[in-house]
Regions:
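S-adenosyl-L-methionine-dependent nucleic acid methyltransferase catalytic domains
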Residues: 1-175
Length: 175
């Protein structure tokens, strides 16, 4: 869970380490973008700036193309813990915060999600994109970011096709 204000009980060094981790992840996110699950394109941010939320740590802006038209979108960005798993209640709280601030979408970035969190896709009108962070980001301090590679990849339902077979059997093809 990422917080922008240090709780009084949290040691300063621990708070600063978490803040540094989030800053490094946002820097990589700005350069690498987010690879979409079902689209050939990626979200490429035109800007990422800090946001004073309890769960949302930044506002990312990007252009979305639809019907030949470009439209700027505002994304609330939630960065999960460096070591640990994002829970469904964390995602729900982040999505609620994003909706309250009129964001178009919540982009959650984490190394791991609980099973129940993986099923959470929308809160009201705000879609929730869950991007799995590449384990290479654990070495982000040493990682030279060229913008290449898929450091943040949105995941969701697998793309499958059901193919009827003889003898009342079916084949499931995973694309």
């Amino acid at each position: 869970m990422h917080h922008n204000a240090r709780p009084s009980w949290q040691p300063r060094a621990e708070y600063e380490a978490k803040a540094d981790f989030a800053a490094v992840m946002l820097d990589n996110l700005q350069r690498a973008g987010v690879q979409q699950a079902h689209k050939a394109d990626r979200i490429t941010f035109t800007s990422i700036v800090g946001w004073p939320g309890e769960y949302v740590c930044a506002e990312g802006r990007y252009m979305e193309r639809q019907d030949g038209q470009g439209r700027e979108r505002r994304a609330a960005i939630f960065i999960g813990p460096e070591f640990g798993t994002v829970s469904r209640p964390d995602l729900v709280s982040a999505a609620r915060e994003a909706a309250d601030a009129q964001f178009d979408v919540l982009i959650a970035c984490a190394f791991n999600y609980e099973a129940h969190a993986a099923e959470f896709e929308k809160l009201g009108r705000v879609p929730v994109l869950k991007a799995r962070m590449n384990p290479d980001l654990h070495m982000a301090g040493e990682l030279k970011n060229t913008g290449a590679g898929n450091l943040f990849v949105v995941f969701g339902e697998p793309d499958i096709r059901i193919e009827p077979q003889p003898d009342e059997k079916v084949r499931v093809r995973v694309k």
